[in-house]
Amino acid sequence: MLQYAFMRNAFVASFLIALLCPLVGMHLVLRRYALMGDALAHGSLAGVSIAVSCGIHPGWGSFFFTALVGVLIEFLRAFFKNHHDLILSIVLSLSVGIAVTLLSSGLIQADIDSYLFGSILVVSTRDLWIMLALSVFCVGTLALRYHQLLYLAFDEETARICGVAADGINYVASVVISATIAASIKITGILVLSSLMTVPVATALQLRVGFLLTLVAAFLFSMLDTALGLVFSYYLNVAPGGFTALVSVVVLMLVIALTQVGRART
């Protein structure tokens, strides 16, 4: 399997995704904003459609449009403070509307199925460099703003009182999430990308350990999910994103069962 260059590229890409998605997903889950990943992933579909119709690399189109959608979500929070789910519905409507309009217009001649469902055949060396650049940007930004993001995740109002520039940090977080999505969609697919942001984190939370240990556990579960999903999708000839999502849910169910059995014995 590893004698093929495309599989080696796919494993490197999966490793980067396994590091990035839980890092961003932890922030979303703790803020009870898990569906934001799904909304932004659909925003990336519109970005890919716009980029392909304009002859731009789809990865960059995905990043810039998804970042714009993320900024729009934060902007709308000021008008719908108690209705975050409504904001996501508005953004989903905008993104899907743009994507469907362009896809049905005949302006797009390329096949974008690989972006919808993921593919291990289309990750080139150029894509890896783009993913690496976006990964460095995401990890570096989150590391610089780690403490502020942690305060916001647990109690935004108290963080504001303590002097944290919540609005600015939220905009930065939206851009980082957008970069993560742009780096991941080619191998995971737009339709199931949000599962890699949230399910490994949900699995790690079952262990009931501290924040840093939970984050480390989420990394490990994410790597396990993506590795198994990639290997099985290769041998079964199915889309890697969908199978990885199935694996992640199965692992979550197993961890829940094992932790419940362990607690019942104590």
UniProtKB/Swiss-Prot annotation:
Give the record's GO biological process terms.
response to zinc ion; transmembrane transport
Q: Does the keyword Cell inner membrane apply?
A: yes
The principal location of this protein is membrane
Q: What is this protein called?
A: Probable metal transport system membrane protein TP_0036
Q: Where in the cell is it found?
A: Cell inner membrane
- Keyword tags: Cell inner membrane, Cell membrane, Membrane, Transmembrane, Transmembrane helix, Transport
Q: Which CDD domains match?
A: TM_ABC_iron-siderophores_like
**Per the UniProt entry, what species is this protein from, by scientific name?**
Treponema pallidum (strain Nichols)
Keyword check for Ribonucleoprotein? no
- State a GO cellular component annotated for this protein: ATP-binding cassette (ABC) transporter complex
| Membrane topology annotation | Multi-pass membrane protein
Q: What does this protein do?
A: Part of an ATP-driven transport system TP_0034/TP_0035/TP_0036 for a metal.
Name the Pfam families on file.
ABC-3 (PF00950)
